[in-house]
Amino acid sequence: MADYLISGGTGYVPEDGLTAQHLFANSDGLTYNDFLILPGFIDFTADEVDLTSALTRKITLKTPLISSPMDTVTESDMAIAMALMGGIGIIHHNCTPEFQANEVRKKFEQGFITDPVVMSLNHTVGDVFEAKNRHGFSGIPVTETGKMGSKLVGIVTSRDIDFLTEKDYSTYLSEVMTKRDELVVAPAGVTLKEANEILQRSKKGKLPIVNDSDELVAIIARTDLKKNRDYPLASKDCRKQLLCGAAIGTREDDKYRLDLLTQAGVDVVVLDSSQGNSVYQINMIHYIKQKYPELQVVGGNVVTAAQAKNLIDAGVDALRVGMGCGSICITQEVMACGRPQGTAVYKVAEYARRFGVPVIADGGIQTVGHVVKALALGASTVMMGSLLAATTEAPGEYFFSDGVRLKKYRGMGSLDAMEKNTSSQKRYFSEGDKVKVAQGVSGSIQDKGSIHKFVPYLIAGIQHGCQDIGAKSLSILRSMMYSGELKLEKRTMSAQVEGGVHGLHSYEKRLY
């Protein structure tokens, strides 16, 4: 009894766990699985946790999630879905500049749509069906010249063409459209709120905005009203358009790609390199900042403070951290360079925060717990590839193998990706090599369903993780880590086994 009845009070609490500074002070490189976060005190519900975090110096996201610029992960469908959920998608550049710019071009989820598809009286029903197949909508305004700024004469909606067949494709729009005198319009200068109220009262699908000369200047869609209601966290720019990023290389011909992307409305460019500490990237940062000073630039990839310093000095607005830690990446194996991701994120974030530069943890994310750990180590956002691959919105077609529904997933350093386009070769400085050295592999991943179901699971998981830690926001989580209040503990291999599913003959692991 005497051994444990030392005091009648509970004022004494022994020191427990390690601060991040102590954990990463030794020479061991740690991954996310090598440590755990010790729980804190809960005095709030999980849904109260604020996940707002900085993507770059000037762009803030309500959800700290980014889809990776890989050709089996992010094109327009993924970027749209990620932005609607409060994150952002980075369109890959393993394609022509024109294709990438078209994927970025903003026509979805806007307040006032100032560049809609417009047709003239000389267009036919077939043209409308072609536009519907290409853009996914059929509410098309008709003007005298078929351009914005021309006199509005009508609109073609799905109700006008629903029951038409191929034999009607040659019919002119003047015969099927809803005429101007039947339309509800709003005057130029109307506020977005007023226009939305008019659209709600009219019960129409589209609301054209016209000037005093009855010329079309913009349009508003009812579907956008519904999206505003259904996606309150959506990432939008000052024009109420969804945020979108794009990756570019660091070579001379990437300057043409950059011009097309800025014309398409890109919000942030990611300089895509496996090793970002190079004269090529520094020169490209200087070029972008001189030509497009307001454009946000993400540099990388880096894993040390020394690498980060050069890019911060060059003027980057955020840093992408990770080298060789992705599930399809073999850089560490082939090149003998890289760093375990836990250590890389902590070391770079601890240095970059002194200059107000946010850090993106890129790679090595296998579970929602890894996301929480990356954020707790100082990352502002987390970039995911394999975790989002094989979702409905990821590029590529599903196929079946042994009865399992799969999608292809490959590293941008794989021979498959490098053979498709030279952009992947430039990322690994190998476009001029006679012999290509693969730094990635190709594989397949089981169908995960839609992003619209998977990302809410990730968001809820992050919130519950922060709740267990006792952090009501991501900014509080980081401040707890840097102040030493957040305590960590290394895990032995036995501890890792214990922390997973064990001791069962068989089991089913359903995450959501």
From Swiss-Prot:
Residues 112-171, 177-235 form the CBS domain. Coiled coil: none annotated. SMART domains: CBS, IMPDH. K(+) binds at G324, G326, C329, E498, G499, G500. Catalyzes the conversion of inosine 5'-phosphate (IMP) to xanthosine 5'-phosphate (XMP), the first committed and rate-limiting step in the de novo synthesis of guanine nucleotides, and therefore plays an important role in the regulation of cell growth. Its cofactor is K(+). GO terms for molecular function: IMP dehydrogenase activity; metal ion binding; nucleotide binding. Its EC number is 1.1.1.205. This is Inosine-5'-monophosphate dehydrogenase 1. The keyword Protein biosynthesis does not apply. Homotetramer. It is an enzyme of class 1 (oxidoreductase). It is found in: Cytoplasm; Nucleus. Pathway: Purine metabolism; XMP biosynthesis via de novo pathway; XMP from IMP: step 1/1. IMP binds at S327, D362, G363, G364, G385, S386, Y409, R410, G411, M412, G413, Q439. PANTHER family: INOSINE-5'-MONOPHOSPHATE DEHYDROGENASE 1, INOSINE-5-MONOPHOSPHATE DEHYDROGENASE RELATED. GO terms for biological process: GMP biosynthetic process. It catalyses: IMP + NAD(+) + H2O = XMP + NADH + H(+). The gene is impdh1. Belongs to the IMPDH/GMPR family. Mycophenolic acid (MPA) is a non-competitive inhibitor that prevents formation of the closed enzyme conformation by binding to the same site as the amobile flap. In contrast, mizoribine monophosphate (MZP) is a competitive inhibitor that induces the closed conformation. MPA is a potent inhibitor of mammalian IMPDHs but a poor inhibitor of the bacterial enzymes. MZP is a more potent inhibitor of bacterial IMPDH. GO terms for cellular component: cytoplasm; nucleus.
